[in-house]
Amino acid sequence: MSGVSELLLPSPVPQGVEGVLHGLHGRWRGRAAHRRRLMQLAEQAERRCMALLGLPETQLQQQLLEIQSRFRRRLLTDDETLLAGVALVGELAWRAVQKRPYRVQFMGALAMHRGWLAEMATGEGKTLTVAVAAVLAGWSGRACHVISANDYLTERDAQQMTPLYEACGVTVASGGGALSPEERQLCYKADVVYVTAKTLLADYLRDQLATRQGAGRAQQGFAQWLTGGAQQPSAMMLGRGLHTVIIDEADSVLIDEAVTPLILAAPQKIPGMHGAVMWAAEVAERLHEEEDYTADRRTRQIQLLEGANQLMAAMAWRLDAVWRSEVRRQELVRHALSVRHFIRVGQHYLVQEDKVVLLDDATGRMTPERSLTAGLHQAIEAYEGVPLTDPNASMGQMSFQTFFRRFHRFCGTTGTARESTRELWRIYRLAVLPIPTHRPRQTVVHPTRVYATLEDKWQAVAAEVAQVHASGRPVLVGVRSVSSSEQLAAVLVEKGLSAQVLNARNHAEEAAIVSRAGQSGHVTIATNMAGRGTDIGLEEQTRSLGGLHVIIAECNSSARIDRQLAGRCGRQGDPGSVVTLLCLEEDVLRQQLSPALLGIARSLPRWGWAAGVLAGLVHYAQRRSEAQAYGQRRAVMQGDEWLNNALPF
């Protein structure tokens, strides 16, 4: 990415009176008048698109060349040019991928082109909408990055829309998967690049690191080249700068993933660390809860008691001198105990080919590029008995909040933005604009049911699956972790029911499992992998039976993620239904509610007014969790701002 991007440094988040005025500006950006104006433009674009239906290919290409020239001269063009361009892309979409944008898709593309976050309900065709907006940006001749929630969606969307981009004279590439530096450099030369936020930010940090390291050598080499003594220096940057970014599933990227900064790191060998980690694992095995230490599962804190301190002191002679201090000993043992009490295989990580691979809680996917810091990753490896890796040393870091505010043009779309409207405007200056649905939604939402124990809940889920399965309708059950998906599958087998399981263990079968999930009588259990971007098509027989039935069997820390799962049914006006079946042993309830409050909840009946109270407790716990996550995101951004202010000095 070129040094030009460095000129656009993000301004601080408005505070005080400036913050109040900024908030009023955000309300103005989201007012209904803007929606009405964009809907009028979308109606005009739809009519103009239909007028191109019988236009010969030669005339269509002439119009394409003329429109491209106009956009290259001025991206934020007048309404006439914009409507002509959008209508042309719509007709080319029909000829290239047999999809003609609906009016609401035109509206979404226009909203993104004008810098809004278009909130489009799940199933409304965001993939095509994003592509229309990306073509307009690509015509400008400046770099456009389309951010997807994961590598699967990156590859899928780029592949599906490639014929449209080619028809519009725009080059496209996908930055997902494992690419060599040369392949990645070539990828970033395309007009439109589909890539995940983590990959793009990591490449940006690598560019900055390479620039700093090579500054002196570059000056010397450039001088030699000018005098004919050396070849022209090769481009170090992976891209053409930070100009336009379009974020699909924007709340996942800007909210869920922004809790921690992205750290570019490299393994660093620390003498004696592996031995110290194994020593701590042995000490932890000898300790007894309540006698030697306490483990608070609500706050996830370990407190070492006198018995633990005595055992550590007695065994300290086996440590290298640098690890013998009381502070270091206690940190090592706390990590070892945390692994045993708070970090669970199948929920937080998997063991694959003798390696610990972390799982993303929001997406349910494996993240082999990630590792835990401060020796915690090595503590997990010691507990699982796999070879210990070296800890990573930070080479550079940046928050997503800081990174995305460096783009000149910033827009996106998602189906679940309303809960985060204020934060999206306050941090990113990104106003949310709701887009109406193409057809009225027919989803039936049943009341939430909350059970006392996990076993009671699994039995209720099995009974619900059996009842709906008997009618011939397909069922999708959403859970949070790999272990929960496998546990529920075993319960269904005991009831004589079989189910396809989609989780991080069998991610390679994702496309095949999703393709069958809408078939009559099919039962699918899925982690959050199926929560975003998953289009479950229905057979005609399935529609006549009532469509897909979604069971939310575990609540997430944010209600937005639950709504994403619910959105797998009732897409494009299809019939469907949703029910939420939970228990008082959900992680978010245990972390956010006091033991006394949970005790009172267990004494309540499961019907009538009490059922509403229990459902209200779930929403209360989720709101508390979301508030904590916002505090973390704010702290991350403040840390970035402090670094930006301190490092120049």
UniProtKB/Swiss-Prot annotation:
Presence of keyword Cytoplasm: yes
CDD domains noted in UniProt: DEXDc_SecA, SF2_C_secA
Cellular localisation: Cell inner membrane; Cytoplasm
Gene Ontology biological process terms in this record: intracellular protein transmembrane transport; protein import; protein targeting; protein transport by the Sec complex
Entry membrane topology: Peripheral membrane protein
Catalysis: reaction(s): ATP + H2O + cellular proteinSide 1 = ADP + phosphate + cellular proteinSide 2
EC number: 7.4.2.8
Alphabetical list of Gene3D superfamilies matching this protein: P-loop containing nucleotide triphosphate hydrolases, SecA, preprotein cross-linking domain
Major localization listed first in the record, in broad terms: membrane
Parts forming coiled coils: none
UniProt KW Translocase keyword: yes
GO molecular function: ATP binding; protein-exporting ATPase activity
Keyword terms: ATP-binding, Cell inner membrane, Cell membrane, Cytoplasm, Membrane, Nucleotide-binding, Protein transport, Translocase, Translocation, Transport
Protein function: Part of the Sec protein translocase complex. Interacts with the SecYEG preprotein conducting channel. Has a central role in coupling the hydrolysis of ATP to the transfer of proteins into and across the cell membrane, serving both as a receptor for the preprotein-SecB complex and as an ATP-driven molecular motor driving the stepwise translocation of polypeptide chains across the membrane.
Family: Belongs to the SecA family.
Protein name in UniProt: Protein translocase subunit SecA 2
Gene from which the chain derives: secA2
